[in-house]
C-alpha cells in the first residue's frame, strides 16, 4: 500500500471537487472517497494484511488523508452554498409593498406521525413502552446480545465509538437485557428511539429511528410473533398488501426471520414488482435469555426491530430518506 497512492487520493478528491458545481455533486464525491464502500475504507480494509509496524504507519497516513479530504469537502460545500446565496441576492427582488404573511398552522412530521401510530397499536395490545440510553456500552449493544467480536457492526467504519467501550447505540436491541433484569415476568415491552450508524445515502442516514419489541413468557412461540406483526402491518399499510415471512439469521434470535412487502411500484408502473425487506424478528436466543437472568428452559420469547423511516417511506412511496431531515417546508406541508 504505497504512501504515494494515498497522497494521490487527496489530489484526485481536490480536482473532482474543483469541478463540482452543486451540493449534490459534492455529496457524490464525498461518498466516492469517504463513503462506506469508498476509496478510503477500501484502503483501511487492507491494513489487516500488514505487520504491526507498517499497520501503525499506514493507519496514521490513511487517517490524515481522510481528514484532509473531509476538510476539502467542507470547504467546497461552504463555497457553493455562499455562491448560491450571492446569486439569490443578486437575482431575486423584494416588493416591500406586499402585505405580510399570515401565520401558518404547523403539521405533524411524518416520522412523528408514524411513531404515534406504532405506539397506539402496540399500547392497545398491552405492550408497555420503556426507554434506554442512546450512549451505550459494548456489553448491552453487542456482547449480551450474542454478537461475536468479529461481527461487521463492531467496525470503526460502521459504528460511532467514543472509546473502546462507549458508543452511540447501533440498534434499540440494547434495551432487551435491561428489561429482562428489571421487569418481572411476563415481559411485554416496546422501545422507540434514535439509533446511529456510519452511513449516508438515499437509503441510510447517520441517525434514524427504530422500534424494538419483545415478549417473554411461558409457551411463547413463532406463531404468536407472526400473528402480532402481520396484524400490525395490515393495520399500518392496509389489508391489501402482500407480505412474505422468510427465514433469516441474527445472532440474538434463533430461529430468525424477516418480513418482506411486495412493492407494487405505484409511482412507476414500468418497474417490475419486487420484494422489499421490512423488518427483522425471531425467537430470542437462549444465550440472550440467560444473559438477562431468565431461565431459557422455562421461558421463551420473541423480539423484533423495525426501521421507522423505512415504514414511512413505503407508506408514502418515497425514494430518498434524507428528505426527512432537510427541514423543507414544501415537503413537510404535504403531511
UniProtKB/Swiss-Prot annotation:
One of its GO terms (cellular component) is cytoplasm. It catalyses: tRNA(Phe) + L-phenylalanine + ATP = L-phenylalanyl-tRNA(Phe) + AMP + diphosphate + H(+). It is an enzyme of class 6 (ligase). GO terms for molecular function: ATP binding; magnesium ion binding; phenylalanine-tRNA ligase activity; tRNA binding. It is found in: Cytoplasm. Binds 2 magnesium ions per tetramer. Pfam families: Phe_tRNA-synt_N, tRNA-synt_2d. Its cofactor is Mg(2+). Its main location: cytoplasm. HAMAP family: Phe_tRNA_synth_alpha1 (MF_00281). Tetramer of two alpha and two beta subunits. Belongs to the class-II aminoacyl-tRNA synthetase family. Phe-tRNA synthetase alpha subunit type 1 subfamily. NCBIfam families: pheS. This is Phenylalanine--tRNA ligase alpha subunit. The gene is pheS.
Amino acid at each position: 500500500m504505497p504512501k504515494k497512492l494515498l497522497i494521490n487520493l487527496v489530489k484526485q478528491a481536490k480536482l473532482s471537487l474543483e469541478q463540482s458545481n452543486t451540493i449534490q455533486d459534492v455529496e457524490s464525491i464525498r461518498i466516492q472517497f469517504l463513503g462506506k464502500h469508498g476509496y478510503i475504507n477500501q484502503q483501511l480494509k487492507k491494513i489487516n494484511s500488514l505487520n504491526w509496524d507498517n499497520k501503525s504507519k499506514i493507519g496514521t497516513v490513511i487517517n490524515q488523508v481522510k481528514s484532509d479530504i473531509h476538510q476539502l469537502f467542507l470547504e467546497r460545500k461552504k463555497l457553493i452554498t455562499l455562491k448560491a446565496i450571492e446569486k439569490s441576492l443578486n437575482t431575486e427582488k423584494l416588493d416591500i409593498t406586499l402585505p405580510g404573511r399570515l401565520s401558518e398552522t404547523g403539521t405533524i412530521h411524518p416520522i412523528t406521525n408514524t411513531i404515534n401510530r406504532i405506539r397506539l397499536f402496540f399500547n392497545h395490545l398491552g405492550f408497555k413502552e420503556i426507554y434506554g440510553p442512546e450512549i451505550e456500552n459494548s456489553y448491552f449493544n453487542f456482547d449480551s446480545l450474542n454478537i461475536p467480536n468479529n461481527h461487521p457492526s463492531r467496525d470503526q467504519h460502521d459504528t460511532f465509538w467514543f472509546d473502546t467501550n462507549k458508543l452511540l447505540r447501533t440498534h434499540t436491541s440494547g434495551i432487551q437485557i435491561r428489561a429482562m433484569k428489571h421487569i418481572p415476568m411476563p415481559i411485554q415491552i416496546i422501545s422507540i428511539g434514535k439509533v446511529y450508524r456510519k452511513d449516508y445515502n438515499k437509503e441510510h442516514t447517520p441517525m434514524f429511528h427504530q422500534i424494538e419489541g419483545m415478549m417473554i413468557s411461558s409457551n411463547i412461540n413463532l406463531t404468536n410473533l407472526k400473528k402480532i406483526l402481520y396484524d400490525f402491518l395490515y393495520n399500518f399499510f392496509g389489508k391489501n398488501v402482500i407480505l412474505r415471512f422468510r427465514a433469516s439469521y441474527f445472532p440474538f434470535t434463533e430461529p430468525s426471520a424477516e418480513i418482506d412487502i411486495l412493492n407494487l411500484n405505484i409511482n412507476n408502473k414500468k418497474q417490475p414488482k419486487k420484494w422489499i425487506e421490512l423488518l427483522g424478528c425471531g425467537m430470542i436466543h437462549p444465550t440472550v435469555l440467560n444473559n438477562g437472568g431468565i431461565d431459557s428452559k422455562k421461558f421463551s420469547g420473541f423480539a423484533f426491530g423495525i426501521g421507522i423511516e423505512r415504514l414511512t417511506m413505503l407508506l408514502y412511496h418515497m425514494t430518498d430518506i434524507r428528505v426527512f431531515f432537510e427541514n423543507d417546508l414544501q415537503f413537510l406541508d404535504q403531511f
